[in-house]
């Protein structure tokens, strides 16, 4: 009887872990599970929010995903950049300052055999510096710690450092209650609320 109870408890735990797993939700890697942190220090974008976001991109901004060079800021597990690669993006650069995050990124990239299509940078996303020899990026994700206006700082840093193509699409995930303080050179194209989270799609204002 004890063994049966233990087996049921183990099965229930396995089901709970499977339901809590973070997966790629579309494209060629659909259904693949990502390695995620054992603590709350890194907060991956939920599957539901990510699916909703990429549905918007697929319907309204498909040209910004397919063949894109992607910059994933505050990358954590890399869920957003890897989702973009799964859906046809050409290359993704992940910016992650923490040791844990970079370890998770390496594991996920290797699991998907994407070493030739990715780069991991150890640096502060709010102080990117000059892009250097890298090509500018077409699609930029920022999922920073909530409520600290770090996404806006990171976008400004990317602009000042030459990381953005003039028509790049920027995606910011933030707490729905957080105030937005964008540099005047950016404009919000669209925003969607998902519970306590808000997703904003942003571009540079047209010159002139």
Show which residues each predicted segment covers:
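Class I S-adenosyl-L-methionine-dependent methyltransferase catalytic core
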Residues: 1-208
């Amino acid at each position: 009887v004890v063994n049966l109870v233990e087996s049921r408890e183990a099965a229930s735990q396995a089901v709970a872990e499977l339901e809590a797993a973070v997966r790629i939700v579309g494209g060629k890697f659909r259904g693949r599970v990502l390695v995620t942190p054992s603590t709350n220090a890194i907060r991956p974008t939920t599957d539901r929010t990510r699916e909703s976001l990429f549905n918007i991109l697929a319907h309204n901004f498909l040209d910004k995903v397919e063949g894109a060079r992607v910059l994933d800021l505050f990358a954590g597990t890399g869920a957003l950049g890897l989702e973009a690669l799964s859906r046809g993006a050409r290359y993704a650069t992940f910016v992650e300052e923490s040791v844990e995050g970079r370890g998770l990124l390496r594991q996920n990239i290797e699991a998907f055999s994407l070493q030739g299509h990715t780069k991991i940078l150890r640096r502060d996303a709010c102080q990117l510096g000059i892009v250097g020899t890298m090509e500018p990026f077409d699609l930029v994700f920022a999922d920073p710690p909530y409520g600290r206006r770090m996404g806006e700082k990171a976008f400004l840093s990317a602009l000042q450092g030459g990381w953005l193509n003039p028509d790049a699409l920027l995606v910011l995930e933030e707490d729905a209650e957080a105030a937005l303080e964008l540099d005047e050179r950016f404009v919000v194209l669209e925003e969607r609320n998902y519970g306590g989270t808000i997703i904003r799609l942003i571009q540079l204002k047209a010159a002139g």
